[in-house]
């Protein structure tokens, strides 16, 4: 599946997108796999309350299943005015 990183998440990880082979069942499982890869992922995903996730371009949560998902995007909460 494709994993996309936006804003400061992209800055901390150092890439905007990657294709990931995973056995993760939920988004949280995927995050744990990524954090175990390298320190830069652990830093980016240290505080999940500061992150939002979208699955196939629909806002979701970290307990959501990944079955059938083709794209996961991580980004900080948006503010508007």
Where are these regions (language model features)?
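Ubiquitin-like/PB1-type beta-grasp interaction modules and other compact soluble beta-rich domains
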Residues: 1-80
């Amino acid at each position: 599946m494709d994993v996309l990183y936006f804003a400061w998440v992209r800055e901390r990880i150092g890439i905007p997108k990657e294709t990931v082979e995973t056995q993760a069942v939920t988004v949280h499982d995927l995050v744990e796999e990524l954090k175990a890869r390298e320190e830069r992922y652990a830093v980016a995903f240290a505080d999940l309350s500061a992150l939002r996730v979208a699955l196939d371009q629909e806002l979701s949560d970290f307990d959501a299943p990944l079955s059938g998902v083709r794209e996961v995007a991580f980004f900080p909460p948006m503010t508007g005015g």
